[in-house]
Amino acid sequence: MYGNEEAVGEGVRRGMEAYGIPREDIFVITKIYPSQFSEPEAAIDMALQKLDIGYIDMMLLHHPGANDVKAYKVMEQYVEAGKIHSLGLSNWYVEELTEFLPQVDITPALVQNEIHPYYQEQDVVPFIQNQGVVVQCWYPLGGRGYTSELLGNDTLKTIAASHGVSAAQVILRWDLQRGIVVIPGSSNPEHIRENLDLFGFQLRSCA
């Protein structure tokens, strides 16, 4: 879907060669998509070929769909073969997980969902965490047209000012204090540094 596996693989190989970075210090996540669930072996083999980095650290099912259990069970076989090291899900919620989890052998290590202050997932997050599964959020800063609105929210700006940080840092810290892994994206070096600088303040309540 994203069409970047070849570029990611090339970047990993270059980094390993140029800087001596061990492969085990790099963690690559990729996905297979509902349109590929009927032929998961072909999708996984293609991902392995395009990445060309020996193995995939984690593979996710991108969204529930027909043959999702079948696809996941094939992914389990690749784990047994050492070609995939861990498995996860994306866009799975309480109802879908309740039906899905009893049908598979390897509990997903991670569930990746959209989570931000306008989409808080107050019921889903604890449900997933109570299964012993890590929650990761995509679009933590709003996404889908909400980023500017979210970062300009008066309440968030007030909280940010009280801590001497940005609204984006408040949002990311809120996620971290809920035990959620965040994956903000940016090509702006200043924003990247800001997104990493989350540990010098504490929010009072993150329920």
What do these predicted ranges mean?
Residues 22-36, 57-64, 91:
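A short, structured active-site edge motif that brings together acidic residues
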Residues 63-207:
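Beta/alpha (TIM)-barrel catalytic core signal, keyed to glycine-rich beta->alpha loops juxtaposed to Asp/Glu
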